[in-house]
Design a protein with these regions (language model features):
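Active-site-adjacent substrate/metal-binding segments within catalytic domains
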Residues: 1-131, 146-147, 167
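Extracellular glycoside hydrolase catalytic/binding regions
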Residues: 128-174
Length: 174
């Protein structure tokens, strides 16, 4: 961790953005041209990594990321609130995300959840669901790390931080 991100044996500082797949007038049904425009803007900014928030993105966008050599964080739509009855859905979402995308060299990490403690207490059911997601991700793809985006108020001693390989915090300025 003290050396940062290493790519092909060399330090590779990550500078990136979080991307949602939507546009005014198109919603989530982006054309290939729109996705190419997004990539061009992201590269123009000097970014080399993208977090594909918070759901499965178009295969064409993953292909563009492969082509451009971008480092990708792909994640499932497990956001803000843990639902006891949602375990099967989160596990299915993770399996589908990995099965559909594990051949994309751009992917560096699989995201387990986003700010899941924003509206949910850290309890054993939430922890168990994250353990199962983490185990599933490693079973389906033992070559990549797992991560989760934590809300900035989460205590650094929270037991949920022990589950993924990499922890991240969303910070909101202004």
């Amino acid at each position: 961790p003290q050396k940062g991100f290493i790519l092909n044996g060399r330090s590779y500082p990550l500078r990136g953005v979080s991307r949602h797949q939507d546009r005014k007038g198109a919603g989530i049904a982006l054309t290939n041209e729109m996705m190419e425009e997004d990539i061009a803007i992201i590269l123009e900014m000097g970014a080399n990594t993208i977090r594909l928030a918070h759901y499965q993105h178009a295969q064409y966008f993953y292909d563009l990321c492969d082509e451009k050599g971008l480092v990708i964080w792909a994640e499932i739509p497990y956001i803000t609130m843990h639902m006891k009855n949602g375990r099967a859905n989160t596990l299915t979402q993770m399996e589908e995300l990995i099965v559909q995308n594990y051949n994309h060299p751009c992917i560096a990490v699989w995201g387990l959840s986003n700010e899941i403690t924003a509206a949910s207490a850290v309890n054993e059911d939430l922890l168990e669901n994250h353990r199962l997601l983490n185990e599933l991700a490693h079973k389906l793809d033992p070559t990549r790390k797992t991560t989760m985006a934590n809300v900035f108020m989460l205590e650094t001693t929270s037991p949920i931080l022990e589950i993924p390989d990499v922890n991240s915090y969303n910070l909101y300025f202004g």
